[in-house]
Structure formats: C-alpha cells, structure tokens
C-alpha cells in the first residue's frame, strides 16, 4: 500500500482517483501531478514502483501544502478573520453561512437543528 503525505492510498484504485484521498489534492491537481511525474493516470496504486512513489512524494512536498499543513493554514486563516472582526469572521463566530447564502430559510447545516418556538394561540 502506497503512503503519501501521511495518507494510505487505497490499493486497487486508479492513481488519478487515489491521489484525491489526500486533503488538498482534487481531480485537477491529481492530473497535473501525474503529468509532472510522467505516471499514467490509469495505473493502479498496487502497481506503483518505489521510484514512482518517491517522485510523487518529492513533487507533493516541494510544490503544495497538503494534509496537516493545509488544515492548520485554513484554521489559522479563520482564526485571523475572527480576531480582526471582519464580516467573514463575524459570520464564523456566530456559526452562520460565510459566503452570502440566504438564512431566512435553509442554512440548517451551519445553524444546526431548528429551535422550535411555541406557536401563536388562536
């Protein structure tokens, strides 16, 4: 089983798909990475040689922030926005959607379950 950036890649998936299991690498970056290293996207993870794994590791570590470093960076960015009190930071602090979505209805993922209020008597 190949291990890159602290993640065990699934055994018999195509490399193009297996690389997306690493936080910070999506489909587009996965294709770009495979082109840079000259590895076929159709190659299965089982069939990787040690040299190919080393080449992938070098490109990933030298080029991008992935996994723990990227998660820490995202958390630090959110903390910074909260500290400076910008609009996005306020939305994060209140647990509301940050990117302009409506909140009169929906937004249940960010707001949590409904808080039922007693109805008006007739």
Curated annotation (Swiss-Prot):
Which keywords does this Swiss-Prot/TrEMBL entry list? Ribonucleoprotein, Ribosomal protein, RNA-binding, rRNA-binding, tRNA-binding
Family to which this protein belongs:
Belongs to the universal ribosomal protein uS13 family.
List the Pfam families. Ribosomal_S13
What this protein is reported to do is described as: Located at the top of the head of the 30S subunit, it contacts several helices of the 16S rRNA. In the 70S ribosome it contacts the 23S rRNA (bridge B1a) and protein L5 of the 50S subunit (bridge B1b), connecting the 2 subunits; these bridges are implicated in subunit movement. Contacts the tRNAs in the A and P-sites.
Could you state one GO cellular component term attached to this entry?
Answer: cytosol
Q: Which stretches of sequence are listed as region Disordered?
A: 95-122
Q: What is the protein's quaternary organization?
A: Part of the 30S ribosomal subunit. Forms a loose heterodimer with protein S19. Forms two bridges to the 50S subunit in the 70S ribosome.
Protein name stated in the entry: Small ribosomal subunit protein uS13
**GO MF annotation: an example:** rRNA binding
Q: Which GO terms describe its biological process?
A: translation
Task: Check the record and name the HAMAP family matching this protein.
Answer: Ribosomal_uS13
* Native species: Corynebacterium glutamicum (strain ATCC 13032 / DSM 20300 / JCM 1318 / BCRC 11384 / CCUG 27702 / LMG 3730 / NBRC 12168 / NCIMB 10025 / NRRL B-2784 / 534)
> Which NCBIfam families does its entry note?
uS13_bact (TIGR03631)
